[in-house]
């Protein structure tokens, strides 16, 4: 992996309290939202806080009545000065109002006519099979597949569209039945969707569904056409320098305008996720027209040149103004003057409402009349309001960790270990990452844990873990235990290859073939081929619950001994081998796929490890909203971990990637943009702590540019984007090219 190239009702008894505005904002609602984590009943929490002098503070005004707030723990409403939980069976991320209410939730699509009775209308939408494993017994849950968005036709409230990461669905009867429209690409990943009637060049209005793909821009389909298929629209959208495809589109909103004669015209507005631009779609020309650019005039180098990383999402049009959610707040754009007007008058109220949750509000619905607008306001992606701190329970523990990797065999307690500790301290670092189960599955520490020892092989170079931990703690070092999970030669061989993935053609344990020798006849026709070279990787089955249990037992053992954090590497499926199409996963249960396997494993890990959990991922999976090839879908995995460590190694990307003039700035750009993109994809649920390339690889860019400044530029890129820590990687343990952490120093180049 290190050198692989990337080409019901409220479930408790409660009283309803008439509450003051201040009490509502500061105490009551956060308690509802945090109740599931803390374990106390809402009634108990409110009673404990009733000492507040509520009579001195005016009650919530009736003008706020009807406001809906969606959160991780459900749906809530302000009514008659009281706080009401409406639906608390899961998280809610979208609120859509037509003739009925529709909600995008973790349980699928939910419908309500009265906000009292709620109906699951997800029949026909896909589900994931999630495996649960406890005390040696496995069970299964049929969990709704993650739905990315939910939109309603602006003229027909019976027509709605939604999508998973690789399939689009439409209903024409208010959710009674969903039809698949397929998908716009072979590569999975999706962000936004929309539906409207669009007038074609022949004068006919046709039902049109739009979708944004993280790699390929905008696509549309007109499902009522004969032999309908997805068509891309790429012209006009901004691309990152050196890239051929548009950067990700964050939101799509069709707006219907009626002229004096009663004719309706539909305009489509769009924004981008990582480049803060606003577009209007020229439907006739099938191209985007850029009408707003927050970073106009920048040269694209990065933060040192004045480029501000920002996101424009959750578009809402009223009159001649487009409102949107952006990093740490709201803003607006005048469609007439094509100027950014800044925060609207209502921003303070919206922001106050957005921060009601003890963790976060995901979505907000404000009825017409509460604000000056001519229609209700719905705001999504409200996690953007609070980008200062990641929303993980271990944020205070795992934030601001800067460290280096100590290779196995070089971390013996005493002078050898002290050398790395001294290097760390001299460079402003406070963390070390060490192999505790290495790339071959060998334990690199001595343990007497009988459960672990049943399957483990302890390396002859295993360290005295107690002495190691003691020495690190005496030096104030934060300890991260790296555990290589599914690439494990020891477990691959165990008990007659019980846990190995197999070659379905031969029935033998599978290994990735790197090359063949071919036998040919005199005309060059291939008669036979023989595998002559294999990848140095032995993969166990990621679907296997006994493999999960073994790795989690090791993690629990290490936490008990004193490690601060567990870091899982090779938390993925194999990606290399000319025979990759012959892999068979014997432990795969019916209905499971790669994503459900990794979710199941990490859910099992989360429920058993009382410490921060980190995962290493390919740089490409941190850059794009897609889990293609590896199953490492950041959106799906981020709820189960605290730290994501993307490997944004410049040497591992295509060598032209972001190498525009001045090419020397490429390492800065990759980490600057990459850290922000990964954080946005994860919706700020995790700490993004990247691996930083502190090694030379004989590729064209490194041959020209690799030096101490190359590594320093990477660190400045991390700092200027989302400054939450980093880790140096050098497989040989040679850190001659690292520099002291820059702190607040000016960018020197």
Question: Predicted segment positions?
Answer:
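Active-site-adjacent "subsite" loops/lids of carbohydrate-active enzymes
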Residues: 394-412, 486-557
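Conserved, mostly hydrophobic/aromatic
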Residues: 432, 551, 558, 569, ...
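Aromatic-lined carbohydrate-recognition surfaces of secreted/lumenal glycan-active proteins
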Residues: 478-488, 567-574, 594-630, 685-696
């Amino acid at each position: 992996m290190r050198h692989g190239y990337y080409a019901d009702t409220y479930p408790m008894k409660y009283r309803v309290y008439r509450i003051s505005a201040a009490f509502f904002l500061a105490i009551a609602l956060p308690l509802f939202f945090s109740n599931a984590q803390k374990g106390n009943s809402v009634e108990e929490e409110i009673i404990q806080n009733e000492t507040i002098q509520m009579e001195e503070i005016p009650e919530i005004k009736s003008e706020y009545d009807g406001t809906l707030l969606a959160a991780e723990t459900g749906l809530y409403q302000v009514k008659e000065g009281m706080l009401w939980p409406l639906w608390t069976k899961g998280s809610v991320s979208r609120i859509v109002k037509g003739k009925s209410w529709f909600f995008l939730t973790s349980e699928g699509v939910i419908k309500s006519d009265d906000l009292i009775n709620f109906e699951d209308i997800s029949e026909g939408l896909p589900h994931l099979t999630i495996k649960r494993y406890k005390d040696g017994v496995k069970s299964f849950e049929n969990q709704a597949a993650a739905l990315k968005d939910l939109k309603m036709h602006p003229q027909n409230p019976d027509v709605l569209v939604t999508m998973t990461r690789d399939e689009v669905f439409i209903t024409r009867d208010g959710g009674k039945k969903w039809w698949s429209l397929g998908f716009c690409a072979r590569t999975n990943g999706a962000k936004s969707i929309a539906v409207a009637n669009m007038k074609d060049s022949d004068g006919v209005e046709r039902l049109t569904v739009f979708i944004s793909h993280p790699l390929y821009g905008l696509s549309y389909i007109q499902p009522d056409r004969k032999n309908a298929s997805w068509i891309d629209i790429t012209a006009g959208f901004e691309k990152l320098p050196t890239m051929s495809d548009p950067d990700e589109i964050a939101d799509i909103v069709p707006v219907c305008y009626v002229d004096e004669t009663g004719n309706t015209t539909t305009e489509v507005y769009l924004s981008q996720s990582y480049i803060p631009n606003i577009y209007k779609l020229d439907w006739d020309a099938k191209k985007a027209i850029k009408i707003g650019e927050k970073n106009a005039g920048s040269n694209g180098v990065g933060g040192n040149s004045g480029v501000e990383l920002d996101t424009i999402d959750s578009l809402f049009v009223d009159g001649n103004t487009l409102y949107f959610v952006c990093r740490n707040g709201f803003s607006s754009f005048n469609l007439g003057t094509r100027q950014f007007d800044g925060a609207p008058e209502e921003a303070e109220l919206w922001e106050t409402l957005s921060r009601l949750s003890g963790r976060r509000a995901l979505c907000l619905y404000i009825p017409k009349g509460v604000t000056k607008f001519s229609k209700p306001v719905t705001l999504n992606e409200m996690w953007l309001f609070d980008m200062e701190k990641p929303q993980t329970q271990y944020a205070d523990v795992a934030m601001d960790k800067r460290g280096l990797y100590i290779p196995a065999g070089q971390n013996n307690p005493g002078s050898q270990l002290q050398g790395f500790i001294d290097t760390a301290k001299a460079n402003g670092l406070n963390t070390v990452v060490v192999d505790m189960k290495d790339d071959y599955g060998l334990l690199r520490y001595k343990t007497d844990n009988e459960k672990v020892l049943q399957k483990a092989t302890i390396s002859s170079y295993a360290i005295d873990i107690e002495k190691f931990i003691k020495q690190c703690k005496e030096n104030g070092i934060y300890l991260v235990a790296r555990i290589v999970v599914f690439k494990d030669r020891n477990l691959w061989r165990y008990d007659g290859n019980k846990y190995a993935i197999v070659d379905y053609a031969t029935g033998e344990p599978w290994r990735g073939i790197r090359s063949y020798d071919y036998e040919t006849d005199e005309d060059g026709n291939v008669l036979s081929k023989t595998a002559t070279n294999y990848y140095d990787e032995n993969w166990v089955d990621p679907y296997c619950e006994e493999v999960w249990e073994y790795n989690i037992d090791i993690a629990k053992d290490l936490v008990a001994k004193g490690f601060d954090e567990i870091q899982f590497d090779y938390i993925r499926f194999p990606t290399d081998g000319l025979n990759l199409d012959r892999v068979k996963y014997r432990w795969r249960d019916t209905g499971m796929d790669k994503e459900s396997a990794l979710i199941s494993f990490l859910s099992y890990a989360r429920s058993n490890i009382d410490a921060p959990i980190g995962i290493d991922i390919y740089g490409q999976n941190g850059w794009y909203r897609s889990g293609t090839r590896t199953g490492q879908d950041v959106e799906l995995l981020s709820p189960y971990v605290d730290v994501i460590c993307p490997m944004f190694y410049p040497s591992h990307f295509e060598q032209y990637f972001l190498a525009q003039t001045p090419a020397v700035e490429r390492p800065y750009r990759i980490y600057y943009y990459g850290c922000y993109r990964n954080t946005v994809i994860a919706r700020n649920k995790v700490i993004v702590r990247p691996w930083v390339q502190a090694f030379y690889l004989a590729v064209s860019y490194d041959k020209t540019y690799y030096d101490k400044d190359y590594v320093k530029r990477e660190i400045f890129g991390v700092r200027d984007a989302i400054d939450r820590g980093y880790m140096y990687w050098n497989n040989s343990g040679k850190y001659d090219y690292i520099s002291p952490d820059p702190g607040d120093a000016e960018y020197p180049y």
